[in-house]
């Protein structure tokens, strides 16, 4: 029986090139990095170098489920991108637009509470204590005028 090859595979609302290896294909999903993609593939029992276009629809659904709920597949909690969620207190793994929306809400909450980090985000300044005397300067440089002859 010959395997059917798909040139485009849809995983987690994202179209992925079927020629990519499993490891590289999963990293193209926002919220899934190299380490998490390797862990998901190994826990699901696939080969890292297999082309993603050769997977059946059931295998793709299983991969998608592993990406959405990595704790079910014995992925350690330190690999999950939203540990101890602010509202629920549980560990979640967010991908694509859910991740972007959650980060935006976090920034808005910091701005609303007028925390130090929130104020720095509002002003467009560095948040993590970097020096600002010479770096993070915005706008055009004044430059030097050339001497007239």
UniProtKB/Swiss-Prot annotation:
> InterPro entries recorded for this chain?
Rbsml_uS13_C, Ribosomal_uS13, Ribosomal_uS13-like_H2TH, Ribosomal_uS13_archaeal, Ribosomal_uS13_CS
Q: What is this protein called?
A: Small ribosomal subunit protein uS13
Per the database entry, which stretches of residues form a coiled coil? none
Q: Give UniProt keywords alphabetically.
A: Ribonucleoprotein, Ribosomal protein, RNA-binding, rRNA-binding
What domain of life?
Archaea
Q: Which PROSITE patterns match?
A: RIBOSOMAL_S13_1 (PS00646), RIBOSOMAL_S13_2 (PS50159)
What job does this protein perform? Located at the top of the head of the 30S subunit, it contacts several helices of the 16S rRNA. In the 70S ribosome it contacts the 23S rRNA (bridge B1a) and protein L5 of the 50S subunit (bridge B1b), connecting the 2 subunits; these bridges are implicated in subunit movement.
Give all cystine bridges in this chain: none
**GO BP field:** translation
**What does UniProt give as GO cellular component?**
cytosol; small ribosomal subunit
The family this protein is said to belong to: Belongs to the universal ribosomal protein uS13 family.
| Residue numbers spanned by region Disordered | 118-149
Q: Which GO terms describe its molecular function?
A: rRNA binding; structural constituent of ribosome
The entry describes its oligomerization and partners as: Part of the 30S ribosomal subunit. Forms a loose heterodimer with protein S19. Forms two bridges to the 50S subunit in the 70S ribosome.
């Amino acid at each position: 029986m010959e395997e059917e090859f798909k040139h485009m595979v849809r995983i987690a609302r994202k179209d992925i090139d079927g020629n990519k290896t499993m490891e590289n294909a999963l990293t193209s999903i926002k919220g899934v990095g190299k380490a998490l993609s390797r862990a998901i593939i190994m826990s699901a029992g696939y080969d890292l170098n297999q082309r993603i276009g050769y997977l059946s629809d059931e295998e793709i659904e299983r991969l998608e489920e592993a990406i959405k709920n990595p704790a079910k597949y014995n992925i350690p909690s330190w690999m999950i991108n939203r540990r101890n969620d602010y509202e629920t207190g549980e560990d979640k793994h967010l991908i694509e637009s859910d991740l972007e929306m959650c980060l935006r809400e976090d920034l808005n909450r910091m701005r609303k509470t007028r925390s130090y980090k929130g104020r720095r985000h509002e002003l467009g300044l560095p948040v993590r204590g970097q020096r600002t005397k010479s770096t993070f300067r915005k706008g055009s440089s004044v430059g030097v005028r050339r001497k007239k002859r």
